[in-house]
Amino acid sequence: MPPDQLLRRTFELCEDFAAARRMLETTPVARPVIYVLTGCAPSQRCVIERTETAFTTREDETSAANDWVPCRPGWEGRIGTHRFLTSSFADAAGYSRARRETLDRWNGACAAANFDWVQEPVLNPYTRLAVAMCPAAGILRTVGYDRNGGPLPEPVTAMCEIALTPAS
């Protein structure tokens, strides 16, 4: 099954975090994929790194940035086209690690409605959308980015916030 279709199916069929995690870990997929899964309880978060038939799940350092943790022989981190012909596999892994470590340092507090965490190396020439979510509080915030002549994108939309009352 294509990874995006598995994700859609998981949203449609799973009633809780545990069921979603099982489905994302065990359903065969057509190609490797990295999922970040978050529930409503503080302990409900993980990164699921999938190959077609196997998985590795991390419950600590639950951010992902286009590379496996730890790096695996035969797999290289993805990089932007501006670095495509000039970066080694080690460089690509380093860029992904830097993004992941930057995200890990963000405290994730949704009380502050800002996107100060969207900075290099998370912010890159291809950033077009930043999203902050808190399922427990029913909050979803987004900001659109685009390049305005500079080397990096800048916010070009107002922050959009959707706040729902959590289900009891």
Kindly give the residue locations of the regions a language model identified.
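C-terminal, well-structured catalytic/ligand-binding subdomain of enzymes
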Residues: 1-168
